[in-house]
Amino acid sequence: MGYFFRGAIMTERADRGAIILAAGLGTRMKSERAKVLHEVFYRPMIAYVAGTVLQAGVTRVVCVIGHQKEAVQAALAGLPVGTAVQAEQKGTGHAVLCAQAACAGLTEILILCGDTPLLRPETLSAMLAQHRQHRPALTLMTTKVARPYGYGRILRAEDDGVAAIVEEKDATKVERLITEINAGVYLAEAAFLFSALARVDTNNSQAEMYLTDIVAIARRSGQQVQPFFHDQPQDVLGVN
C-alpha cells in the first residue's frame, strides 16, 4: 500500500531522530486489533504519525513495536521507518530504551505516540525550531483543555519552565484545576535522554518505567525543561 504526505517535507537534519511508541496493547479500545492499526480514512493511525514525523524533516525514525508487531510493520511498509521491539510491556520509559541502539549518533530525539493521527508536520517543525534555538535538555509539548480529567497536569516553575508533570491520581484538588496538560510529545537532547532514563525506577503503582519521570530528573539536576505550547488541543488528541 502506498502512502501520500500532507504537504512539503521540512528541512532535514541527519542528527535528528524520532521514536514513535507503538508497542502497547491498547486495552481501552476493547478490540482484538492493536490500537495503532485502527484506521482513520482508510489508513492505519501509525502511518499518519510516521508520515507526519518524516514531513517535519526527521530523517531517522524508529517505531517501537510489540503487540501484533508483524501487522504494525506491514502498516509501515513503503515508509522509510525502522523498528525496535519491546518484548515486554514495562512502561513508556522502557519502550524508549528499547530504541536506544537504533538512535546511535543522534543529538536530538523526538518522542511521540502512535495514536495521534491529527498531529501536523508544521507543529513538529515549530517545536524543533524552538528547541534548537534555546537548547534545553528537554522540550515538552503542552496544550490547554477545558476538561483536563485524566491528563497529566503541567506545573510551571518560577522561570516559566516545566517543573513537573502531575498525573491525575497523584494531583491535589488545586492541581486538578490546572488546564494545561502534557500533550505527550517530547524533544530531548539524546545524551540527556538516555542518562536520565538510566535513573528512572519502577517504584510506582504500575511497577513500570514512566517516561514522564525524566522531567523531574532534569529539574533536580539543574537542567532546563522548556514548554512548547500548542494552542490547538484537537491536533494532539490521542485515541482510546
Residue ranges, per PLM feature:
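His/Asp/Glu-rich metal-coordinating catalytic cores
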Residues: 109, 114, 122, 141, ...
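A short, conserved acidic/glycine-rich loop-to-beta-strand motif
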Residues: 134-144
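Catalytic-core segments of class I nucleotidyltransferases/pyrophosphorylases
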Residues: 163-240
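Short beta-strand/turn micro-motifs composed of small residues
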Residues: 22, 65, 113, 142-143
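Rossmann-like NAD(P)H-binding beta-loop-alpha module
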Residues: 143-174
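Conserved N-terminal catalytic core of the sugar/cofactor nucleotidyltransferase
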Residues: 2-17, 44-129, 133
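Short glycine-enriched, charge-decorated loop/helix-capping segments at active-site entrances
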Residues: 33-39, 200-203
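N-terminal nucleotide-binding beta1-loop-alpha1 segment
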Residues: 9-31
